[in-house]
Swiss-Prot record:
It comes from the Eukaryota. This is ATP-dependent RNA helicase glh-2. Residues 256-267, 370-381 have a biased composition (Polar residues). GO terms for cellular component: nucleus; P granule. PROSITE patterns: DEAD_ATP_HELICASE (PS00039), HELICASE_ATP_BIND_1 (PS51192), HELICASE_CTER (PS51194), Q_MOTIF (PS51195), ZF_CCHC (PS50158). It comes from Caenorhabditis elegans. The gene is glh-2. One of its GO terms (biological process) is cell differentiation.
């Protein structure tokens, strides 16, 4: 309501009539106005009328009822009170306000900016009407009921309350809201954006219009039934000048989602790249002094004003102290006042002790909060700090039958209905069948009888799942018995939500600047780098040898000057064997299936020639094409590998016109889509997200020239992504294999995968093998610890230098300075080991499929920068990751096949740097014979116990010489 209500007592300047100009029966009339004011009082009543700036104010009263009328800026205010009732009318800026109160009721009417507000109260009821910006608000209260009506921006709001009921109506932006409450019930109606919201109930009703921007608690943050952002509605406003104002209805404005540390958008404070700012010390809420919380405050407890958003204010409806029906009084009889709360809207807070809107349980006036000690009832400390002897507490009883000795879920008695649960009893949310959402009968948040508890396993009654006679339910993920879903060895299935989709991804990554990107993955060549050049190279086409002119240096490759500078800046000095052959072969247009050891530079082997050709031919995706038409699609098996290849591509494309974009699950879909819609010449991503964007038309494959599968054996394997790969290559818009160049790279290529891969390659493709296919990196020293499951934990602690008895570590232990990756098979084990290591003061972190993408990215970041030197990982980290300075890989659990073993140990020993791999293994491991072959291929020592367990004559079985390197020979290799 307008502050102009205070003008009722203004002195007359032009025309004034006083001393009962038209008074009857000993009444008095007052009138004031800049242009004209009228007031009349009859039968001992009092009438007030006020008008300013050409407005008209009319006040009249009969039978001892007060009436107030106020008009400002061309508005008209009418107020009428009869039979002890009170009427308030206010009109501002050409609006019209009508207020009428009869038979002890109260009526409020307010009109602003050309709107019309009607308020009527009869027989002790209260009616509120508010109209703003051409809207119409009608409020009517009869027989002790309360009606609220609000209309804004051309909308219409109707509120009606009868027989002790409450009705709320709100209409915004041309919409209409209706609310009615009868027989002690409550009706809420809200509407926004031209929709219609209807709420009515004999017991309870709740209605909301479009977008849920109005109605109960309407708007973005607004008050009870308020408008957008808390404005212009019942309950809107702040601590003053608000209709029903108070904390909860306060307009908080648009929510700020910026970083708390640097105030920039796009990330949270724990991801902020800026230095952490010191926060101001927190102070006591009661005395505003630092050093303690309000519950421990030695000062006298101060009353909290406007708590829960539904108490006083200082002016406007809802102001004052005391109870009753006075307007804005501040002394006693304040309408909707804070204290006592009798007969006022929101009295005693929102919902007073009696006769107030929402009175009773849910909105009950709790009075001053008791912060005394629970044990001795004295202030100044909590019960756990109490110096008095602990008092015995009464035994807990069953919630259902009130008898001790058992919980309600085990109660043998018939289940009783729980009345008024969730804090809404009697009044606002009240009782069994009255109030907002109360009890058993209809309403918002109603509590229907729950019925008997059912077994979680079989859904039967009479027992709990722990006592169920039926077989236990299988794994939630795969349906098999014997394990839970968090320990499931099978690939995780997406969990569908209400719309048939998984949970929405919200992660938006913060990209590193280019200098950080260049330094992040810069791994210097190690002392064993030349071992790569000792490997035998086989290059064939249709099983026939092929001659190739190799590129011994990057300067010999067909790279532009800008890319050559970027390659040098990235720390590349000499081409590896895989790069020497693929750089010219890809430039010549061949399809390739390439196999080389881990850590030998395969990513650069396909990225450099593809990017150089596209830049040289100026074949780039530009904004003029009207969408994302990538020239190259790179598919990877994991999000982490996608991100790594993306950053590698950023280095090579630096200061060129080429754009490379990552696409993978876990990123916010809207953000990811917005990035690629800007255009991307190269898309690198995981299969699922790329398939999704292709199907919806965001990624258009018509101009795709290069199709790359990294870790191709995993991508094509029948247990991997083979079906989805087939779907992508068979899209109608995807060029046929004869019209595109297909490239496949991996460190392992089983025969079965090679056969399946041929379906995607042109006739005459090149098969390139550096060393033996499936050979381990010779720069990695492979060690084995024979132990059973119960010995693994202690063995791990011993290797990491942790005292098994005291769980302590020497400060100068290598575990703090060297990076270690521990591979496990189950997510639960990863979390368990991380907890154990952390308790021993060893900084450890986990990465597995159950972690959110934000957590996975943060884990890799902390491992890369050394703040967490131990990474415990599942299979998501076993392929492709190129992390600088990994000294040791530990296979806590052995993988299922030899190829995964080779990939795991390949996380160390990169680019000729010496690495170490330790595997915990038992004598019945099914990989023993293959491990013997891998060790022999790498010229490493085979433990005697492994020779015997694998059958002894391993050399003849795999075509190797029967002699095994001696310990001395092995030392010479290192």
């Amino acid at each position: 309501m307008s502050d102009d209500w205070d003008n009722n007592t203004a002195a007359a300047k032009t025309i004034s009539f006083g001393s009962n100009p038209s008074g009857f029966g000993g009444g008095s009339g007052f009138g004031s106005g800049n242009t004209g004011g009228f007031g009349s009082g009859n039968a001992g009543g009092t009438g007030f009328g006020s008008s300013n700036n050409g407005g008209s104010g009319f006040g009249g009263n009969n039978n001892v009822g007060p009436r107030f009328g106020n008009g400002n800026a061309g508005g008209t205010g009418f107020g009428s009170g009869n039979a002890g009732g009170t009427g308030f009318g206010s009109g501002n800026a050409g609006g019209t306000g009508f207020g009428s109160g009869n038979a002890g009721g109260t009526g409020f009417g307010s009109g602003n900016a050309g709107g019309t507000g009607f308020g009527g109260g009869n027989a002790g009821g209260t009616g509120f009407g508010s109209g703003n910006a051409g809207g119409t608000g009608l409020g009517s209260g009869n027989a002790g009921g309360t009606g609220f009506g609000s209309g804004n921006a051309g909308g219409t709001g109707f509120g009606s309350g009868n027989a002790g009921g409450t009705g709320f109506g709100s209409g915004k932006a041309g919409g209409t809201g209706f609310g009615s409450g009868k027989a002690g019930g409550t009706g809420f109606g809200g509407n926004s954006n031209s929709g219609s919201g209807f709420g009515s109930g004999l017991t309870n009703g709740f209605g909301s219009g479009n977008n849920h921007e109005s109605g109960f608690g309407g708007g973005k943050s607004g008050g009870f039934g308020g408008g957008n952002s808390g404005g212009s509605g019942f309950g809107s406003g702040g601590n003053s000048n608000g209709f029903g104002s108070g904390g909860g209805g306060q307009d908080r404005g648009e929510r700020n989602n910026n970083c708390f540390n640097c105030q920039q958008p796009g990330h949270r404070s724990n991801d902020c790249p800026e230095p952490k700012k010191e926060r101001e010390p927190r102070v006591c809420y009661n005395c505003q002094q630092p050093g303690h919380n309000s519950r421990d405050c030695p000062e006298e407890r101060k009353p909290r004003e406007g708590r829960n958003g539904f108490t006083g204010g200082s002016s406007g409806f809802g102001g004052g102290n005391g109870g009753g029906t006075g307007f804005d009084s501040g002394l006693t009889n304040g309408f909707g006042s804070g204290n006592n709360g009798e007969s006022g809207f929101g009295s005693g807070g929102f919902g007073g002790n009696s006769n107030g809107f929402g009175s009773g349980g849910g909105g009950q006036d709790r009075g001053e909060r008791n912060n005394n000690c629970f044990n001795c009832q004295q202030p100044g400390h909590r019960s756990n700090d109490c110096p008095e002897p602990k008092k015995e507490r009464e035994p807990r009883v069953c919630y259902n039958c009130q008898q001790p000795g058992h919980n309600s879920r085990d109660c043998p008695e018939e289940r009783k209905p729980r009345e008024g649960r969730n804090g809404f009893t009697s009044g606002f949310g009240g009782g069994n069948d009255g109030g907002f959402g109360g009890g058993n009968a209809e309403g918002f948040g109603n509590n229907e009888e729950r019925g008997p508890m059912k077994c979680f396993n079989c859904k039967g009654e009479g027992h709990r799942s722990a006592e169920c006679p039926e077989p236990p339910r299988g794994c939630f993920n795969c349906g098999e018995q014997g394990h839970r879903s968090n320990e499931c060895p099978n690939p995780a299935k997406p969990r569908e939500g209400a719309e048939g989709e998984g949970p929405k991804a919200t992660y938006v990554p913060v990209e590193d600047n280019m200098e950080e990107v260049f330094n992040m993955q810069k791994i210097s060549e190690g002392l064993m780098f030349n071992k790569f050049f000792d490997a035998e190279v086989k290059i064939t086409s249709d099983k026939k040898p092929v001659g190739v002119k190799t590129c011994k240096t990057f300067s010999e490759a067909n790279l532009g000057e800008t890319m050559k500078k970027n390659v040098a800046h990235a720390g590349y000095t000499k081409t590896t064997p895989i790069q020497q052959y693929t750089l010219p072969l890809i430039h010549q247009g061949h399809d390739i299936m390439a196999c080389a050891q881990t850590g030998s530079g395969k990513t650069a082997a396909f990225l450099l020639p593809i990017m150089a050709r596209l830049i040289d031919e100026n074949d780039l995706n530009t904004a003029g094409e009207g969408g994302c038409y990538p020239r190259c699609i790179i598919l990877t098996p994991t999000r982490e590998l996608t991100d790594q290849i993306y950053n590698e591509g950023r280095k090579f494309a630096y200061q060129t016109m080429m754009e490379i974009r990552p696409v993978y699950g876990g990123l916010a879909v809207g953000y990811n889509k917005g990035q690629i819609e800007k255009g991307a010449t190269i898309i690198v991503g995981t299969v699922g997200r790329i398939k999704h964007f292709c199907e919806e038309g965001t990624i258009k494959l018509d101009k795709c020239r290069f199709f790359v599968l990294d870790e191709a054996d995993r991508m094509i394997d029948a247990m991997g992504f083979g079906t989805d790969i087939d779907t992508i290559v068979n899209y109608e818009s995807m060029p046929k294999k004869e019209n595109r160049q297909t490239l496949m790279f991996s460190a392992t290529f089983p025969d079965s995968v090679q056969e399946a891969a041929r379906n995607h390659l042109k006739e005459g493709y090149i098969m390139l093998a550096i060393d033996k296919i499936g050979a381990a990196n010779k720069c990695v020293l492979q060690e084995f610890e024979k132990c059973d499951r119960s010995e693994k934990k202690d063995k791990l602690l011993e290797i990491l230098g942790i005292d098994i008895d005291s769980y302590t570590t020497e400060k100068n232990s290598e575990v703090y300075t060297k990076k270690t990756i521990v591979f496990v098979s189950q997510r639960a084990m990863a979390d368990t080991l991380a907890s154990i290591l952390s308790s021993a003061q060893v900084p450890a972190i986990t990465i597995h499929g159950a972690r959110e993408q934000r957590e996975r990215s943060e884990a890799l970041r902390q491992f890369r920068n050394g703040s967490k030197p131990v990474l415990i990982a599942t299979a998501v980290a076993e392929r492709g990751l190129d992390i600088k300075g990994v000294d040791h890989v530990i296979n806590y659990d052995m993988p299922d096949n030899i190829d995964d073993y080779i990939h795991r140990i390949g996380r160390t020993g990169r680019v000729g740097n010496a690495g170490r791999a330790t595997s915990f293994i038992s004598e019945d491991c099914n990989l023993l014979s293959e491990l013997v072959r891998v060790l022999s291929d790498a010229d490493q020592l085979v433990p005697e116990w492994m020779q015997g367990a694998s059958g002894g004559n391993f050399g003849a079985s795999f075509g190797f010489e029967s002699s095994v390197p001696t310990q001395k020979q092995d030392e010479d290799c290192w």
